[in-house]
Amino acid sequence: MITSNDFKNGMTIEVDGEVYSIVEFQHVKPGKGAAFVRTKLRHMKSGNVSEKTFRAGEKVKRAHLEEREMQFLYAAGDMYNFMDTESFEQYTLTKDQLEDKTQFIKENMIITVLFHNGEEISIELPVFVELAVSETEPGVKGDTASGGSKPATLETGATVNVPFFINEGDIIKVDTRTSEYIERVKGE
């Protein structure tokens, strides 16, 4: 058990038997009355975000999640299929469970799948992924002096801003937490 004073962004807690991830929280001390903690919680199974208020010091059960390395096999409609790299068992997660993380996964990528009480509930992406640029405007000579950027569509369909010297076919490193370009790994 933890108290509402121990909350951190990304922490997983159990509320009414359901698992939630803390998106953001704020300690509030009103002029009159007791202090409280206002939170935004993401339901780990459905991906829905809701607001909940806890009394300061209120005890909450921390959700313990099991992590397993899995290989992403394929997507069929809104269903994403993964295979356990040790037991070769296959698991399916919905697009809602994966939230916006689908824009950075490609076939055969190794991903951490999160389980709670033996049931798969979400995934954890690597911090950095290397993806090919499938579409971007060509850079014009002299554009780099301003240090600007242009949008680029990646092989997974994600769109990120990249420097002008990046071309179609280049492989770039992207931070999955912020959706930002980090560096060019390999150019054409």
From Swiss-Prot:
Gene Ontology CC, one term: cytoplasm
Instruction: Spell out the SMART domains in the cross-references.
Output: EFP, Elong-fact-P_C
Record GO terms (molecular function): translation elongation factor activity
Q: Which UniProt keywords apply?
A: Cytoplasm, Elongation factor, Protein biosynthesis
Pathway participation: Protein biosynthesis; polypeptide chain elongation
**A Pfam family:** EFP_N
The record ties this protein, via CDD domains, to: S1_EF-P_repeat_1, S1_EF-P_repeat_2
What biological-process GO terms show up in the record? peptide biosynthetic process
Q: Where in the cell is it found?
A: Cytoplasm
Entry function: Involved in peptide bond synthesis. Stimulates efficient translation and peptide-bond synthesis on native or reconstituted 70S ribosomes in vitro. Probably functions indirectly by altering the affinity of the ribosome for aminoacyl-tRNA, thus increasing their reactivity as acceptors for peptidyl transferase.
Report the sequence similarity comment from the record. Answer: Belongs to the elongation factor P family.
- Its name, as the record gives it, is Elongation factor P
This protein's species is Natranaerobius thermophilus (strain ATCC BAA-1301 / DSM 18059 / JW/NM-WN-LF)
